[in-house]
């Protein structure tokens, strides 16, 4: 039994089986039955639902959340440019690439029989050709790796964006 389908890893893993979640939007008269490849994140629910109910919230209040109502309704096939993921390390997911930041943590959890995605080397996967994340192509794509690292650097520099 493999509930995560073609994806590698599992719960608490940096691989897609640990982070990818199906998302279904059904709103009678507003949405049509179809599959979307728009890149959205659960963190976007706050900003999207706020817009939907007409509540104005500042970017400072919602930190990383972005309004994705057009993607939810099928009017925007793109969604976000990228999503930052966090397990035991950080990841950057675009429609084409997945980058996993180097990490010296354990690579495998024997209690859950799960690959965790931790590796001391950069990991880059071509999500168009390798959805299962089995072929690390970081060595052959140094410019993409550098670009993804820069996204992470910029996101980390932002901090959490709100006072606790």
For the regions a language model picked out, list residue spans one by one.
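C-terminal cap/loop subdomain of S1 sulfatases and analogous C-terminal strand-loop tails that border
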Residues: 1-16, 31-32, 38, 43-123, ...
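The feature captures the short pre-catalytic strand/loop hairpin that immediately precedes
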Residues: 23-32
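Intrinsically disordered, low-complexity polar regions and short flexible loop motifs
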Residues: 130
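Active-site-proximal N-terminal segment of extracellular/periplasmic enzymes that hydrolyze or transfer
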Residues: 135-143
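Charge-dense polyanion-binding interfaces
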Residues: 147-164
């Amino acid at each position: 039994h493999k509930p995560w389908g073609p994806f590698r890893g599992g719960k608490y893993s940096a691989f897609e089986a640990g982070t990818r979640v199906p998302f279904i939007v059904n709103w009678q008269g507003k949405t049509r039955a179809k599959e979307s490849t728009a890149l959205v994140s659960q963190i976007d629910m706050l900003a999207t639902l706020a817009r939907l109910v007409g509540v104005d919230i500042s970017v400072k209040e919602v930190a990383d959340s972005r309004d994705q109502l057009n993607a939810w309704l099928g009017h925007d096939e793109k969604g976000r440019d990228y999503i930052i993921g966090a397990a035991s390390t950080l990841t950057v997911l675009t429609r084409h690439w997945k980058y996993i930041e180097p990490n010296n943590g354990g690579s495998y959890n024997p209690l859950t029989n799960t690959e965790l995605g931790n590796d001391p080397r950069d990991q880059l996967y071509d999500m168009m050709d390798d959805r299962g994340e089995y072929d690390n192509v970081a060595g052959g794509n140094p410019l993409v790796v550098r670009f993804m690292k820069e996204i992470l650097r910029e996101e980390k520099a932002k901090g959490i964006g709100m006072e606790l």
